[in-house]
Every structure is written in C-alpha cells, then in structure tokens.
C-alpha cells in the first residue's frame, strides 16, 4: 500500500445519490488512520448526513475528513488517555457499547470487535473487518507473545488474560444480534463462519489506491529493471525472504518502499546480497514513478485483505504474491499476477522469474483494479441497506 499516502477515491468517483432516511452508522473507535477508518469514511459518503456512533473519537489521531461527519462518541470518550490509546480501553468497552442504543431503521456497523454490539430499534447490518483480534489473535494484535515489551503490550496482555473469557461470551452474543453480515475478504468470511457460525457476504472494501494520473518524481539511485516490494518492515511481512529471492535472479534489482523496526537488519542483509535499494518512506509522486517503472510487485506476507497488488494493478503492473490470505481475492493468477505457495526463498524466486518472463496486458490488469472501486462498494452497500429498510 502507499506509504504515508492519504489519497483515496472520494465521493467524486461515483454519482451523488439521494439520501436514505433512517440510516445510522457505527464504528469501533475513530482514533487512528487505518483501513477500517477509510471504510467508515466511505460509508459516511454513501449515507451522507447519517450520524456515526463510536466509542472514542480522537480527531488529531484520525483522518481529517471525519470533521465533516456527525461523529457521536460515547461517554467513555471523556477520558483523554483512552482516546489516545484505545487498547487501554479494552476492559471498559463492552459495557460502554452495551449501554449504547441507537434509534434507526437500519444501523450499519463497521466492526472489528465492538460496534457490532450496539443495539438498535431497527435492522442491523455488520461490516466485519475481522473477528475481535484481541480475543482470537491476542499475540499478533498487541505483541503479547514471548519477549514482548512495553507498558501498553503488558497492559493489553493482562486485560486479555483477565477479561478474555467474559469478552468472548459478550462477543458471540453481539455477533448474533446482526440481521446481516458482510466481510472484506474470503479469509474473514471463513473466520466469521468458524468463530460465529455465520454465513457472510464478501464485499471488498474500496482500497486507498494511489491515483495513477498524478504528479511523478523519479527516485535517485534506482537501477532498472527492478521489482518493487511495498510493506512495513515487520517480521511477518517476510521482506528478508524477498531480498534473498530477488538476489538470486540475474540482472534484476529490488526496491523496497516502507519503514519499520526491521530496517537496520534488512539494510545489513541488502548490503550483503546486493541489488537491493531500501527507499524508506516515499512521497506519492515517487511511489507513482516506482510503480510505473517496475517490472512488477512482490508480496510475501499474510494479509486479511491484499491491498498492494491492487495499487500495482492501477498502474498495469502484475504481482508475484503468496497464495494465501487476501491475495486470493486481489490477484487473478495468469491475468494480474502469479502465486507462490510458501513464504520461502526458492518459491518466491521462482514466482518472480515467472513474472518477469510472462507477457502481461496492462489494460486487463487495470480493469481488474477498477472492480474494487469505491463506486462499486457504495452501490452494493446502498442496495443492501435498501433491502433491510424494506424488512423494517
């Protein structure tokens, strides 16, 4: 995905629709800048004027576009320390959400674990980004595994250990108050089925794809031909494996966009194997140049929703991706990219070699990216809400 990029498709991307009366929105907490918050903004554009109920609202920590939304935080929002770090609020959020009742014909809840528990007088549609990670993937969510450090991680670990059993009961009950479940990917569809026993429709979110028609600025020191890897430098992103894999391929360089705690280790590895440039954080203009000039993208991490291949596809570039997770939804093998079966150096190298040898149709790849547009997301969302309004 774009690093430090805030560009996204906006309401200008689809025709203005007449407002639907009786619709309210909900989101877990409006305190950060993430994919779930982008979805909440898309929902707000789809249902202009609808109030957005949430546990916590921290304007300085989230997208500025929320200033134009009727955000209605709960009383727990009075505690500034919780607004600034919603994870510390974990022990208190179930009670806060349970106390909130929304008068609406349809409540559309954007949820990763809390908003689906808000009660309503009408129908409830839940858009699930993932079942509550702090309950079902606690180590990954908060870094609470062996060796984790820091007050926040320890606090969240204590909270999940102490409150986890009761929160799981609450979460299960909350999930089954929904009249309809939507999910962002087939991966989450399976998780919702396994955890809740609920059948959900897959409605991919509108990705914050970098516009391909903006300004461009070249990146110094980049040799061509090259493949691109766009990722936060974290262990589970498997960037080290990508470095070693591309280093095996003659006459091909690798450019890595992104930053993170693994940077120093990856710089040492890149220096040792050669043919690798760690570009760090780049501007939108530089990222456009990189996508436009790359042979393709390499994506080797497990993701619930595989965004970066769609960003590459907007520039007509194919992707070599791990055959797992969200990439199963966002890469069309043979048309927009190739898969490798395991995050292993040999597998990645073979896939990248296949990508460089194949002939790709730029127009087909771009057309694939267009199927994930905000216009399509909004149209289906409005159709679903209209159906639920008729049930009310």
Language-model features: where?
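Acidic donor-binding loop of glycosyltransferase active sites
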Residues: 292-304, 317
């Amino acid at each position: 995905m774009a690093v430090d990029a805030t560009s996204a498709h906006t309401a200008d991307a689809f025709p203005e629709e007449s407002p639907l009366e009786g619709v309210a929105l909900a989101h877990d907490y409006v305190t950060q800048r993430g994919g779930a918050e982008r979805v909440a903004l898309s929902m707000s554009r789809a249902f202009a004027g609808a109030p957005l109920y949430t546990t916590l609202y921290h304007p300085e920590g989230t997208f500025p576009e929320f200033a134009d939304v009727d955000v209605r935080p709960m009383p727990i929002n009075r505690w500034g320390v919780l607004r600034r770090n919603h994870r510390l609020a974990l022990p208190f959020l179930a009670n806060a959400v349970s106390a909130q009742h929304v008068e609406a014909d349809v409540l559309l809840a954007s949820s990763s674990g809390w908003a689906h528990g808000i009660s309503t007088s009408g129908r409830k549609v839940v858009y699930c980004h993932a079942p509550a990670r702090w309950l079902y993937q606690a180590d990954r969510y908060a870094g609470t595994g062996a060796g984790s450090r820091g007050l926040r991680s320890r606090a969240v670990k204590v909270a999940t250990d102490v409150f986890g059993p009761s929160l799981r009961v609450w979460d299960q009950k909350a999930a089954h108050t929904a009249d309809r479940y939507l999910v962002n990917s087939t991966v989450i569809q399976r998780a919702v089925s396994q955890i809740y026993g609920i059948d959900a429709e897959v409605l991919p979110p509108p990705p914050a794809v970098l516009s391909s028609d903006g300004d461009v600025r070249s990146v110094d020191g980049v040799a061509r031909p090259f493949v691109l890897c766009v990722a936060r430098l974290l262990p589970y992103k498997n960037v080290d494996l990508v470095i070693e894999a591309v280093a095996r391929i003659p006459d091909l360089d690798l450019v890595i966009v992104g930053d993170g705690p693994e940077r120093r280790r990856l710089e040492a590895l890149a220096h040792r194997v050669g043919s690798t440039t760690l570009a760090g954080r780049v501007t939108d203009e530089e990222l456009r140049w990189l996508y436009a000039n790359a042979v393709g993208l390499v994506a080797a991490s497990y993701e619930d929703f595989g965004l970066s291949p769609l960003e590459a596809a907007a520039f007509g570039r194919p992707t070599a991706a791990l055959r797992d997770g969200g990439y199963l939804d966002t890469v069309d093998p043979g048309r927009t990219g190739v898969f490798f079966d395991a995050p292993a150096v040999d597998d990645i190298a073979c896939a990248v070699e296949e990508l460089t040898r194949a002939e790709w149709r730029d127009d087909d790849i771009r057309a694939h990216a267009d199927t994930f547009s905000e216009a399509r997301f909004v149209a289906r969302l409005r159709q679903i809400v209209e159906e639920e309004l008729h049930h009310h």
